[in-house]
Amino acid sequence: MELNVKTLEGKDAGKVSLSDEIFGLDPRQDILARMVRWQLAKKQQGTHKTKNRSEVSRTGAKMYKQKGTGRARHHSARAPQFRGGGKAHGPVVRSHAHDLPKKVRALALRHALSAKLKAEELIIVDQLVASEAKTKALLGSFASLGLTNALVIGGAELDGNFKLAAQNIPNVDVLPVQGINVYDILRRGKLVLSKAAVEALEERFK
């Protein structure tokens, strides 16, 4: 399929041919959901921790004698039922990451790209280059493209001026093509790809 190419100023710059195997799939929500869950689980810190009965700072002595008091039998005050005691089955430091096959991850990226094209939220620009690192000038360019919430994907190397100008714009993320991922694609409204990014993606999935 073919899609119009725009300049940063919003003018026409020809057409580009997109592979149906990457941009023409029927998006599957289950695959996208699995991928987002995998990304967020991998990102989660997992530093949560509570002290159990062997870790709390408290005497380990028996509270009172076993028999003769008429009260319930107890050992130390570290037990979970007492105030200041250890937590029973509390959270521990661990990794929340889980496995997801590499083929499923690759498929999810293609489905995310297809979903953006199907929703008419994909914009192809000829190049992501700024003459100077001025946020105001880049905001004007984005306004001409109708961008207020977007993920912008450039080639393997980002233009320094463009990167600096864009990093102060709210709700706009800029990544090189090797950093493209399903979660960032879905969390932003529009997806902007440079022609270099399209070529790199088609080479990657060849």
Curated annotation (Swiss-Prot):
Keywords: Ribonucleoprotein, Ribosomal protein, RNA-binding, rRNA-binding
Compositional bias ranges of the Basic residues kind: 64-77
Matches recorded under InterPro entries: Ribosomal_uL4, Ribosomal_uL4-like, Ribosomal_uL4_dom_sf
One example GO MF annotation: structural constituent of ribosome
GO cellular-component term (any): ribonucleoprotein complex
Domain of life assignment: Bacteria
Gene Ontology BP terms: translation
Region (Disordered): 42-93
Protein family (similarity comment): Belongs to the universal ribosomal protein uL4 family.
PANTHER family: 50S RIBOSOMAL PROTEIN L4, LARGE RIBOSOMAL SUBUNIT PROTEIN UL4M
Quaternary structure and interacting proteins, as annotated: Part of the 50S ribosomal subunit.
Biological role: One of the primary rRNA binding proteins, this protein initially binds near the 5'-end of the 23S rRNA. It is important during the early stages of 50S assembly. It makes multiple contacts with different domains of the 23S rRNA in the assembled 50S subunit and ribosome.
Protein name: Large ribosomal subunit protein uL4
Protein species of origin: Agrobacterium fabrum (strain C58 / ATCC 33970) (Agrobacterium tumefaciens (strain C58))
Taxonomic classification: Bacteria, Pseudomonadati, Pseudomonadota, Alphaproteobacteria, Hyphomicrobiales
